[in-house]
């Protein structure tokens, strides 16, 4: 049986020896068409096609070879091609060796040479595309060349050449590879022939051999050849070897008739049908319309929707939103300088100059950055003509002021640049031109929508930061995307790199939300520790090591419940702990010296010596001459004599640097028994009140018991508090020091019992009673130590007050004392100020305190006050100074604005949630560990350099604290409570009085309380010249960097948008083996969908940006000449179409249906899912909708006429620039039904412009398959630059792709279909490469406006078109 099989195999004729393939293909397997001296293959089999490419009789046709390797992937796999090549190669070798003396040997050698040329072309030009990404193909090829046995010199040279070419490509495409030739000791020809080349380890599969466990990284060249469309298109052109124009394929007469018939039959789904184009129809109407109805828009997505014009394997993008109005989801990403149209320029080819408005904010006249001190003419009334502009600026400014500045990376200059470059406001000077009075207040609503979208993210981030301290987390997110390739070219389509900005902010918001949710959902069942000493240690954040120089210090507990410290203040410095290297402290020794096992009887009538340490700050300045009252939550009942103190450097904001110095003496008058007694009692009472309320919110199960404890304690101390408030009041500055006071008193049983809490939760606990008795017994022992140090304490107290009384605080944060926060949850600002105004007015009755020169700094601006959500408590920036509370008598008591600013609406559990999360890592059952050994570990050790950097404030014009300001304003200025009217009015310029919803309600309340808010102030006339300077001041107040253009260094490719597109072009199946897994791109992929979901939550809520406010709208294009706009649009189209890869065109890789994008921001966040064609289509559609939106939203008929004329002139300039893509966008928009219905407006158009329009609108005619636009494209002058109209090419490709691929399934290939595709693609790529001849300067302001455009949704356009007059 086996013999029969062998005979049968011998009788089988090799594939390439069959008559129809040897020596050349016959007509039965390959049909050609000779046209103009070139050979076009119409149909063929795959073996016949390979035979034709390596024909021994015909000359080498490099054009055919190039076309084949461009399109073969559409009808066969690379593995199958390599199989055919190997089979033909081996067949030629066998043929040569079969009869060395015959003619067949010569033929076989020619075939081998032609096959070598074919393989060399493949390896040289498509190694990165085919072999780098396909491990199995590489192994198959290596098996082919390694399996060759030396025969003769001719064949050896072919194999050696292929091996050398392979090794050369491998060395170029992978990094971290040693010199393979040297490593394998390859020197001679024999070495090359014997060398079995190994594949490069990928790391993603189980490789064998040494060193194969670690995958190699691809080189920059490899990545560029894989995912950079610009480089790939240039490489394609380099293979053509022609200086001629590549023509579009010519169709026969029969084919043209068939295509014309198809065009008429498929009108409803064609890319172009301008006669019936209407972008104004709503989405619902389009869904219900018929396929051939006039609803068909000029948008490319209409053809994409047709399944006939799309590939079966095309992906469908997820809808951006399930809401019909996508425009409510997000808008443009650009931050314009203002939403203003600054100048009206006459139409460029205009026949008449109608009016020109002088710009108030041009690059050449940018005002210098000022602090607004020269603003004399202020506007704070309800000026309706400017409410839109000023209100929007105020709202956005407030967002940035609320944003914490501890992490400057989170507020990059690009955000300010977006507002600077994109916000378009009309000019405020009318001059002699007859314009409507309301024109001066108009702005581009579409541009403002773009800014509002980004500001939405900023406000969300600010709100989260106000609830959670996430400095380290957000810093990591900011650094996540800082690695940019500065060597690449400047990116035009995202010139402000807003994709990175938005991604960074969104990542921060996502991370903060996760952290906040984890902490909020975290439940705790800890019991309060019976050890009040442990609780006290927690409260002071390991203050004991600061007392290392005094071994006799001690502390006593006067209250069983002390509050949790607040660490959730995102804008305030945290208390610094300077750890003792010995991890020991005198306080610890004093406590450990007395064993708690020595329980004595509780002596309720014993004498007590109570000591207290308080941290002085801006909130602790309400005190009495005889009884010092501390209102600062940061006080802790620790007896201190002297300690290293923190010195604040003047004019350096928020801990730019600090040092330590010896403590100074203080006034002994502050150490009187009366002072000590009142201070201890009142401070402890207030501290207990605030903190216990916080614990109530955090632990709901214990609310009733703790509430009873607090109530009992408050009742016992109410008389003392009242007495303190009635004493003679004093005024003393914040000293930035620690102050110690003691109270020697003899407490009666009744008085002591009145102070003790009566909570069954605590007093009913046996362990608590035992330990409290132990503390009572130890009190007597510790009292002796206290007496021995009293003299030293008195001396140090004197030094404190004398030397530190004039130190100025340099912080500007507006915060609240937490005890005020919880004193009355229902208190209103009016109620508080009634009590405090009387206190303030008493200042004039007392001698003024000498004001140090260093303290004379401007008063804080009310508009810079942070929002309610960022109000701090104990650990605010103001509380960083450790200040003495001891002060001289006969000083007037003063109440700061911060204390008025006391209403905090966020829940108290937000304030304490961070401590709750960090509770008790050892999982004991107590809220605070009773272990006394933990005293040194109550606070983690801090890195001072990190803290210093963390709290540095970028602002250069910060004001001093209100304590210092009040000292500086003790003269006649105190008549207005220390408020500078001029400064206040300057800030009020940015407040929109008529739109209270855009204002911070706390700022509004403060202004009313201070008497500086007046709605009845006189209105400013619209034509007043002061209005111009007013708007300029608003721009300055927004703290925008005044740069006329981006620096030269910024012209590098900053766009993360481009980089992410490059990385996502690689096939997902091989990306992990090609890209470094630690790269920022890989880490960000996990959050891309979350970012999109976050942006989708944005809804348009500002009434000033809705279509109801159309009377305020004016297109920004009216502030620029049409030539400039055409130039910038050309730059944008050049880079957009450069993202279209030749392979995407050949495969027609585009989505069957695209969402309706209404802003460039939507495209930025979705770009990774879009092919180059999809990106170009989406941009085309967005631009058409934007043009229609600008015209429809313009209500004034003259302005609408000017807008239409301006677009006509821009289109004419685009035609001159050979920018046919933008030209067609404008023509299709102007020819839409929505725009054409404004008949009265068209009647006002200049006759010359109407003639120009008649010529332009004939360009997209369907006659003879778009013969007009094709003629324009064919007549292009290459050296002048060109932007081809991509829709023509997509139309041709769509029609061609409908042809059958196989005439006989899997046997006879319709190769003409693919040759036609290649010809179309090469024509497009060549014309796109001519765009490099453009020599256009970048105008960053105008470019930003043109890039980050926003359009109305179709429903909005439809709604306006029905309401607008004809």
Curated annotation (Swiss-Prot):
Ranges annotated as biased composition (Polar residues):
671-690
Q: Does the keyword Cell cycle apply?
A: yes
What SUPFAM superfamilies does this protein's entry cite?
Ras GEF
Per the record, where are the segments of Basic and acidic residues compositional bias?
A: 298-314, 661-670
Q: Which residues form the N-terminal Ras-GEF domain?
A: 37-170
The processes (GO biological process) annotated in the record are: cell division; Ras protein signal transduction
Major place of residence: cytoplasm
Q: Which domain of life is it from?
A: Eukaryota
The disulfide bridges present are none
GO molecular function list: guanyl-nucleotide exchange factor activity
> Where, per UniProt, does this protein localize?
Cytoplasm; Bud
* UniProt-listed CDD domains: RasGEF, REM
Region (Disordered): which ranges?
290-314, 661-690, 955-979
Location of the Ras-GEF domain:
1121-1361
**What keywords would UniProt list here?**
Cell cycle, Cell division, Cytoplasm, Guanine-nucleotide releasing factor, Mitosis
**GO cellular component terms given for this protein:** cellular bud; cytoplasm; plasma membrane
Cite the InterPro entries for this sequence. Ras-like_GEF (IPR008937), Ras-like_Gua-exchang_fac_N (IPR000651), Ras_G-nucl-exch_fac_CS (IPR019804), Ras_GEF_dom_sf (IPR023578), RASGEF_cat_dom (IPR001895), RASGEF_cat_dom_sf (IPR036964)
- Protein task: GDP-GTP exchange factor component of the mitotic exit network (MEN). Fine-tunes the timing of the mitotic exit and couples this event with cytokinesis. May also be involved in proprotein-processing in the secretory pathway.
**Family assignment?**
Belongs to the LTE1 family.
Q: What is the protein named? A: Guanine nucleotide exchange factor LTE1
Source organism of the structure: Kluyveromyces lactis (strain ATCC 8585 / CBS 2359 / DSM 70799 / NBRC 1267 / NRRL Y-1140 / WM37)
- Gene name, per UniProt, is LTE1
